[in-house]
Regions:
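Short, low-complexity N-terminal intrinsically disordered segments enriched in polar/charged residues
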Residues: 19-52
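Short solvent-exposed beta->alpha transition segments
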Residues: 40-41, 48, 56-109
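Short charge-dense sequence patches
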Residues: 24-33, 77-84, 127-128
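Bacterial N-terminal signal peptides
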Residues: 6-16
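Exposed beta-sheet edge and beta->alpha loop/turn motif
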Residues: 97-147
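Positively charged n-region of N-terminal signal peptides that target proteins for export
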Residues: 1-4
Length: 147
């Protein structure tokens, strides 16, 4: 009888451990989805400002540390130089996202890199990469590239 109880106890503990591992993995997957969804929404909102050439508002949505290093006028000139050659956005689709704690030239933190496939009037197939940093509970754009 003791052997049966011991076996059942071991089986229950093993099952609980498996459930805890599954729950932990499931919870991490859900956290990843939530993080990615929030970062993607922030990137899409920021891109809509850039699409409308509202560079002043896009600049205001960057982290303070970046605004301290670049004036609004510098940012606007830079964005005009990057985006004007491509023309108007015709379509944009999400490709994927990647999370990291390290970003070259930036302090360690929470970064999400979002990649989009974009069609412009002057370039039918381009890629846009938006890197965001989680700061004070918000996703803020720290880098933008269009290829």
């Amino acid at each position: 009888m003791r052997l049966v109880v011991a076996c059942l106890t071991c089986a229950c503990l093993a099952l609980l451990g498996s459930c805890a591992t599954h729950h932990s993995t499931s919870q991490k997957t859900e956290e990843k989805r939530t993080r990615e969804k929030e970062a993607r929404a922030a990137a899409t909102e920021w891109l809509s400002l850039v699409d409308a050439a509202d560079y002043a508002t896009a600049y205001a949505r960057e982290p303070e540390r970046l605004r301290a290093a670049t004036t609004q006028e510098q940012f606007i000139r830079s964005m005009e130089g990057r985006r004007a050659p491509f023309g108007r956005v015709l379509s944009r689709s999400f490709i994927g996202a990647a999370f990291t704690h390290k970003l070259t030239g930036s302090p360690d933190g929470h970064y999400e890199s979002i990649l989009f496939r974009t069609s412009f009037t002057n370039k039918s197939l381009a890629a846009e990469r938006v890197i965001l940093s989680r700061e004070s509970g918000k996703w803020l754009v720290v880098d933008y590239r269009v290829y």
